Amino acid sequence: MKKPPLVETTEGGKMVSPKLPAHIKNFLIDIDGTICDDIPNEEPWRMADAEVFPEALARLNEWYAEGHIITFFTSRTEAHREVTEAWLKKHGFNYHGMLMGKPRGGNYHWIDDREVRATRYLGHFSELVEKRATVQVFEE
């Protein structure tokens, strides 16, 4: 796994959290229902044999090869880490990290001091395109 090329930044003479170069995306990718069958934590015996979505494998490995950061962000628990890592390796996914324990239930609303973009997975990994959408923001 390659280390991300973070750029150190200062504001007002003080160091702030580093940033990725603008041309590199920091992808957080769900696992169940996004790159493979949707398997709930209550049925972990199915995780080792989950059906991979070939289009997801190809697209994520393409993004990795282009230098983007690939991190899986899943509702699977730490107890599922070993089977999940083995499954990703078996299918040939290239990635930088995996965050376990994402809150379950959807309806996510991410608040951050950095730019955040969201793409809802609707069944296939195509090219990403620009679209205008209505978003909720804090009142100024």
Question: Model regions: which residues?
Answer:
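HAD-like aspartate-dependent phosphatase fold
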Residues: K2-E140
